[in-house]
C-alpha cells in the first residue's frame, strides 16, 4: 500500500489480475502510468492488489481463482485485467475458469470497445483518415453465444455429439440495447447500427431484432440501421465513415471488435470495459489483445491498449480530468512517433511507457 495513502482525498482500490504472457508486461506498464497520474495530480490514490490467477499457477495448483475469488473481487472498486491464455492449458479451460466467470458473476453485462486511429498512426485502409474511423462497439457480455450451455455426448466414441446453445433473453437483450442507444445518443452523430444474423438464426436473433426495434421507439433522436454480421465486415472495410455506434451479440462483437482494432492500426491499441452499469459490482478493464506467448517477457508488447483501458477505468471511477489527460498523453506520444513495431515504430514497452509517464508529468506537473 502506498505510504502516502492517508493524505489524499480519495483512494481507489484496484484488483490487478495480470494473467498470462504479455498480460504481465502490460499490467506492470499500466500500473506505473496510473501511479504517475495519481502522483502528479495529487487528488486521488490507487491501492493496487495483485492476484496471481495465471495459467502457470493453475498448472501448479489446479485452479485459477480460489473458491472465494469472486467474493474477494467484490471488495474492490474496479478490476484491471491483463490477458489470459497459455499453450499448456486448453483455451476453453482458461477462459471459463477466469475471465468469463468474472464477467457473469459480477453482472458485467456490457462490454464497450471504442475504436479510433491515434495521431501518428495510420489505418491499413487506403485513404482512411483519422476522422473517418471513430466507432464504439457495444457488446452483449453475459449471454448469447457464450452462455456456456451445452455438452458433448459419446465423447470418446466415433459418434460424438456436441451442442453449444445460445441463450437470448428479453431482459438481457433490452438492457444492452438501452445501453447502446444511450451511448449513441451521447455521441455527436446519434447513430446506432444493430448487427444480427436473423436471416439464418430464426429464434434468438429474431428476438434480438424485435427488442431492438421496440427499444428504438424510446429514442426517436437516434438514427438506426440493421446489418447482417457478414455484410457488416464488408461495410467496416469499404465504408468506415458510415458507422458510429454499433451493438452486437457476444460472439459477433467479439469478432467485429478485433477487425475494428486491426483497421485502426493494431490490435495492440484497443481497449475494452466490462461494465456493471448498476455499479453494484466492480467493473473490469482490459486491452482486447491476447496473451501473445511468442513475445511474452521480451519487453516489446504494445502497451497502448493497456493505457487506453486504464484511462477508461479512471473515467469510470469519476476522475474525468485524469482520464482526459491520460488520453492526451497517449495521443501526444504516438503523434511524436514513439511507437512499438506493430504501429511502425521502433520503441519497446518500456520506451513507450517512459514517454507516456513523461508526457503526463508535462501536462499536469509543468515538466519539460
Model-identified regions with their sequence ranges:
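N-terminal phosphate-binding or glycine-rich loops at protein starts, especially the Walker A/P-loop
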Residues: 2-49
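Glycine-rich phosphate/nucleotide-binding loop
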Residues: 57, 235-336
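Buried hydrophobic positions in well-ordered alpha/beta secondary-structure cores of metabolic enzymes
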Residues: 20-23, 77, 138, 180, ...
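N-terminal glycine-rich phosphate/adenylate-binding segment common to multiple enzyme folds
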Residues: 58-163, 251-253
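Flexible, glycine/charged-enriched surface loops at secondary-structure junctions
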Residues: 42-47, 187-196, 219-227, 319-327, ...
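Glycine-rich phosphate/diphosphate-binding loop of Rossmann-like nucleotide-binding domains
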Residues: 15-31, 157-229
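Short glycine-rich or small-residue beta-strand-to-loop segments that form or flank ligand, phosphate
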Residues: 13-22, 80-85, 192-198, 308-315
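N-terminal beta-loop-helix "entrance" segment that forms/cooperates
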Residues: 43-66, 236
Amino acid at each position: 500500500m502506498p505510504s502516502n495513502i492517508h493524505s489524499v482525498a480519495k483512494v481507489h482500490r484496484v484488483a490487478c489480475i495480470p494473467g498470462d504472457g504479455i498480460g504481465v508486461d502490460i499490467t506492470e506498464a499500466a500500473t506505473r502510468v496510473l501511479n504517475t497520474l495519481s502522483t502528479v495530480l495529487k487528488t486521488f490514490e490507487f491501492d493496487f492488489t495483485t492476484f496471481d490467477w495465471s495459467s502457470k499457477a493453475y498448472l501448479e495448483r489446479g485452479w485459477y481463482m480460489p473458491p472465494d475469488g469472486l467474493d474477494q473481487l467484490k471488495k474492490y472498486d474496479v478490476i484491471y485485467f491483463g490477458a489470459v491464455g497459455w499453450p499448456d492449458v486448453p483455451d476453453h479451460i482458461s477462459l471459463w475458469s477466469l475471465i468469463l466467470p468474472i464477467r457473469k458473476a459480477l453482472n458485467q453485462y456490457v462490454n464497450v470497445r471504442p475504436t479510433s486511429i491515434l495521431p501518428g498512426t495510420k489505418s491499413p485502409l487506403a485513404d482512411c483518415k483519422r476522422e473517418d474511423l471513430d466507432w464504439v462497439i457495444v457488446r452483449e457480455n453475459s449471454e448469447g453465444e457464450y452462455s456456456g450451455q451445452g455438452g458433448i455426448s459419446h465423447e470418446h466414441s466415433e459418434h460424438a455429439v456436441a451442442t453449444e446453445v445460445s441463450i437470448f433473453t428479453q431482459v438481457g437483450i433490452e438492457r444492452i440495447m438501452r445501453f447502446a442507444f444511450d451511448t449513441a445518443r451521447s455521441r455527436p452523430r446519434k447513430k446506432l447500427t444493430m448487427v444480427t444474423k436473423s436471416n439464418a438464426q430464426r429464434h434468438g436473433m429474431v428476438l434480438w431484432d424485435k427488442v431492438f426495434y421496440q427499444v428504438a421507439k424510446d429514442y426517436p433522436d437516434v438514427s438506426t440501421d440493421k446489418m447482417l454480421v457478414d455484410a457488416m465486415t464488408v461495410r467496416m472495410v469499404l465504408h468506415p465513415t458510415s458507422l458510429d455506434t454499433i451493438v452486437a451479440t457476444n460472439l459477433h462483437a467479439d469478432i467485429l471488435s478485433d477487425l475494428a482494432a486491426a483497421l485502426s492500426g493494431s490490435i495492440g491499441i484497443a481497449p475494452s470495459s466490462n461494465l456493471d452499469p448498476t455499479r453494484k459490482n466492480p467493473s473490469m478493464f482490459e486491452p482486447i489483445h491476447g496473451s501473445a506467448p511468442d513475445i511474452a517477457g521480451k519487453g516489446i508488447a504494445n502497451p497502448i491498449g493497456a493505457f487506453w483501458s486504464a484511462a477508461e477505468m479512471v473515467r469510470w471511477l469519476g476522475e474525468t480530468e485524469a482520464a482526459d489527460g491520460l488520453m492526451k498523453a497517449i495521443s501526444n506520444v504516438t503523434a511524436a512517433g514513439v511507437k512499438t513495431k506493430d504501429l511502425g515504430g521502433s520503441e519497446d514497452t518500456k520506451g513507450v511507457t517512459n514517454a507516456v509517464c513523461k508526457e503526463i508529468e508535462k501536462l499536469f506537473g509543468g515538466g519539460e
